[in-house]
Design a protein with these regions (language model features):
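Boundary/linker segments flanking structured domains
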Residues: 1-63, 67-154
Length: 154
């Protein structure tokens, strides 16, 4: 059971930062869906576990937040999705590989396009600050990272 244990931190002052986000239109697919129709455009994405059943209330656990492309990168949402499909088979990022395999069959991939010229890195930092996903380690605002390290969360 201990391998499934993850610490989730929800801080009201961080959650309030949602009001600072630009307007994002989120799309959702089950992770590992064969050949999904994903955009060749920069954006942000998140992996979550959603336990869907008619007898359960809506729920979601954000596990990881990332970016595809940035003001100086041509990476796309479609390319990043394919990277994660490969990562599930070949371990180049141990923590992410573990997440993808531990929760295989239960992961949802959420993505939102971000206009060219807008920093996906800034949006990623805002999202990691709001959710503090347990599989993110480096993509936090400096002051948030320091607080998390001080609390022995990172």
């Amino acid at each position: 059971m201990s391998k499934y244990r993850r610490e989730f931190v929800l801080c009201p002052s961080f959650i309030r930062k949602k009001d600072e986000l630009p307007d994002l239109v989120w799309n959702t697919i089950k992770f590992n869906e064969p050949s999904p129709n994903l955009p060749d455009h920069q954006g942000v994405y998140a992996f979550s576990i959603n336990v869907e059943h008619g007898s359960l209330p809506s729920n979601s656990y954000i596990l990881y937040v990332g970016k595809a492309g940035d003001t100086t990168s041509n990476n796309t949402i479609k390319k990043r999705y394919r990277d994660y499909i490969r990562e599930a088979r070949v371990q180049s990022r141990p923590k992410i590989h573990r997440m993808l395999n531990l929760w295989a069959g239960h992961l949802t991939y959420h993505y939102a396009e971000v206009p060219n010229g807008v920093s996906t890195g800034d949006i990623e930092e805002q999202l990691t600050t709001i959710f503090i996903p347990p599989y993110n380690t480096n993509d936090f605002l400096v002051e948030v990272r320091d607080l998390l390290k001080g609390a022995s969360i990172l």
